[in-house]
């Protein structure tokens, strides 16, 4: 019987897709650690540089502490870090020696697996990042084939990329990453064999979102075609714009005759925990989605769509939404079909909005579009339309951005921030506002425990304590009395 493994995305991609990356803090994760470890997942999709920034900015949690404590609590389950390769928190491509230090610190603090996702599919960039990772530790490296629908992203395109990247001895495995949920069963039947034919005996995993209801079936079809692991979200962290829900995936795989490398009793306990967290924290659970054929055309994620709709409403132009959606497809074609993963969906749709409400197309252009055309995000997969490129670059702002400072060299940053800082603090200060890092350090260690049952009560008490007229708060029940007085903190 063929065994299929599972990769749990709840703490990183599930959290990001469903709750804007701000749903879960360190205490939520630490409380789940032993439950997750008991399940037997192949790996945990745990963090990224943007998630590390959210930990600092939003929760004042130290992301390095979070990583260390989670790794200690989960010694047999690799924690995964996903990266575009040569960037860390900041949008600019970093100095290679700076990234070497990033990869060294991540592995020293507990990362056991890296995903290299270059949205432009630049082979040299992926190979260089893999080399840096391997030179600084022993973590496994997985190359991402980021799926999208366009005239250039064919099966042959992905096979050629996998073959070229696979020449590097530093690439341990591959995965098909479908961040928008565009992969159909029919396309899986041609794409998976095309990739497997060129990667030799290296494993191939699948990561297919359920945004328009295709992720479950595409993943099950990929299982028939020889993939080694399927990425899933647990309980409320699955379905919706996240990944297929884990318990349903296990049931479907077993129904199809596969052995699933998971402890189902442990998975049930973990599911119950996340359900209680979602209820206590007001986090909407993912729900199975109906198929939406229009999404295959515009590929606009729900969060970006909502933001643009709100902007149009504020301008009194809500009736132009259909025009903006149509223009989004044209802008994407003009720019060489960038894959609609961060930051490109925001960039493309904002430009479409400018084109619709402006005097003419590309009369107003965002800095990010100019930088994209300059190649500051990497070389576009397909050339930018020549006339559009000329229009974008023939403006004063483009000339200003041509002289934009490069990311500083590691040695210069060391001189700027001092040579005595621990590497972990130095890396955060190099790319984040000082006041945010200061606030994180002042907050001290993160809580290690969390009780979903107590969370609503604590939230109510904090709200009451914040009211200026509330001088004393008393909660009583038989055999129990809690009194809070002005000046106390929660």
Indicate residue ranges for each PLM-predicted region:
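Surface-exposed amphipathic alpha-helices with a cationic face
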Residues: 67-75, 127-137, 189-200, 250, ...
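Catalytic cores of alpha/beta
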Residues: 153-163, 212-228
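C-terminal helical cap(s) of enzyme catalytic domains, especially alpha/beta-barrels
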Residues: 238-261
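Conserved, mostly hydrophobic/aromatic
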Residues: 6, 14, 36, 116, ...
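Active-site beta->alpha loop and helix N-cap motifs at the rims of alpha/beta catalytic domains
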Residues: 34, 43, 47-163, 180-184
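Terminal or standalone catalytic/regulatory effector modules within metabolic enzymes
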Residues: 37-38, 43-54, 288-295, 299, ...
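N-terminal small/glycine-rich loop or linker at the start of catalytic domains
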Residues: 1-22, 74-91, 138-149, 193-203
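Glycine-rich phosphate-binding active-site loops on the catalytic face of alpha/beta enzymes
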Residues: 116, 178, 225-244
């Amino acid at each position: 019987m063929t065994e299929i493994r599972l990769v749990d995305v709840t703490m990183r991609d599930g959290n990001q897709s469903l709750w804007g990356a701000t749903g879960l803090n360190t205490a939520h994760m630490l409380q789940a650690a032993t439950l997750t470890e008991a399940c037997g997942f192949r790996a945990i999709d745990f963090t990224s540089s943007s998630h590390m920034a959210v930990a600092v900015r939003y929760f004042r949690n130290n992301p390095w502490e979070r990583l260390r404590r989670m790794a200690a609590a989960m010694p047999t389950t690799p924690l995964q870090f996903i990266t575009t390769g040569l960037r860390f928190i900041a949008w600019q491509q970093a100095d290679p020696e700076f990234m070497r230090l990033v990869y060294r610190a991540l592995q020293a603090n507990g990362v056991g697996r890296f995903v290299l996702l270059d949205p432009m599919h630049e082979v040299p960039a992926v190979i260089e990042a893999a080399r840096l990772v391997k030179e600084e530790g022993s973590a496994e490296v997985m190359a991402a084939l980021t799926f999208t629908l366009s005239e250039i992203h064919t099966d042959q395109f992905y096979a050629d990329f996998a073959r070229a990247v696979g020449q590097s001895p530093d690439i341990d495995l591959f995965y098909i990453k479908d961040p928008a949920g565009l992969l159909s069963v029919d396309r899986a039947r041609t794409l998976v064999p095309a990739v497997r034919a060129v990667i030799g005996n290296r494993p191939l995993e699948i990561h297919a979102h359920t945004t328009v209801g295709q992720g479950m079936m595409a993943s099950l079809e990929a299982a028939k075609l020889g993939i080694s692991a399927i990425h899933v979200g647990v309980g409320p962290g699955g379905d919706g714009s996240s990944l297929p829900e884990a318990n349903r995936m296990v049931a479907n795989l077993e129904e199809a005759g596969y052995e699933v490398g998971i402890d189902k009793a442990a998975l049930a306990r973990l599911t119950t925990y996340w359900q209680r967290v979602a209820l206590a924290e007001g986090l909407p659970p993912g729900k199975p989605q109906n198929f939406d054929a229009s999404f295959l055309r515009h590929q606009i994620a729900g969060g970006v769509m909502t933001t643009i709709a709100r902007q149009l409403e504020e301008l009194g132009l809500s009736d132009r939404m259909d025009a903006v959606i149509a223009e989004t497809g044209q802008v994407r074609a003009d720019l060489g079909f960038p894959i609609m993963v961060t930051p490109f969906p925001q960039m493309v749709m904002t430009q479409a909005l400018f084109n619709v409400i402006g005097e003419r197309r590309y009369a107003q252009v965002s800095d990010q579009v100019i930088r994209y055309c300059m190649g500051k995000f990497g070389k576009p997969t397909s050339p930018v339309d020549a006339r559009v490129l000329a229009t974008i670059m023939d403006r004063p702002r483009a000339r200003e951005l041509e002289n934009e400072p490069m990311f500083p060299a590691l040695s210069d940053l060391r001189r700027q921030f001092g040579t005595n800082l621990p590497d972990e603090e130095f890396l955060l200060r190099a790319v984040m506002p000082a006041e945010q890092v200061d606030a994180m350090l002042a907050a001290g260690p993160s809580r290690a425990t969390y009780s979903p049952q107590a969370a609503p009560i604590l939230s109510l008490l904090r709200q009451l304590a914040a009211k200026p007229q509330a001088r004393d708060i008393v909660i009583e029940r038989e055999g129990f009395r809690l009194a809070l007085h002005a000046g106390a903190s929660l």
